[in-house]
Amino acid sequence: MNTIRYYLIKQILIEENELVQIKDILSYEQPTKYLVTKTEYSSDDSLIPVLTANKAFVLGYTDEKFGVYDKGECIIFDDFTMDMKFIDFPFKVKSSAIKILTAKKGFNLKFIFEYLSFLGLSSIDHKRHYISEIEQMKIRMPNDYKQNQVANFLSSIEKKIKIESEIYILLIRQKQYLLSNLFI
């Protein structure tokens, strides 16, 4: 996936595309009203997920029905680590260091997420980065048709990878079951 993303974004960089600042294509929202109040999380995945932008991603689940982000697609961006995740389901967050990013009219959020992922943003300083650095960055944006093409293509690959990963896990389980019954 990274190789394909790299190739597609490299193509966009060499083409004559509009140079825009991040602040002109993304809006951000502070997560204050979506913060979880309980720190005891459930493992019941039928509840509301509590998210973080880092590797843990889903910290657990909560039964809190208030303050749930349910406005549709967004990117959660950790202001300290610059980790980010593309989200398309209702959630709550644990940390006030998260920025909730949404695309402005005429821009494809999934495309922007893939572009920012391509850039490999990372932090060595423990400070807030979004307003002071990320919003000021300039990136090359193709027209909305091309944005949608790239976003849809990468999304279809992600779906295929997810399906194949699930099949792989099922095959491993089947193998373990067969091996356990082989020597009975």
Label each residue range with its predicted role.
Residues 2-3, 7-35, 41-55:
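Non-catalytic DNA-recognition/assembly elements of restriction-modification systems
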Residues 31, 121-122, 156, 184:
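Conserved helix-loop functional segments at active or binding sites
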Residues 39-50, 63-95, 116, 128-132:
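Short, surface-exposed loop/turn microsegments at beta-strand edges and helix-strand junctions
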Residues 52-55, 77-79, 102-103:
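Pocket-edge structural micro-motifs
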Residues 82-144:
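Basic, amphipathic alpha-helical recognition segments used for DNA target recognition
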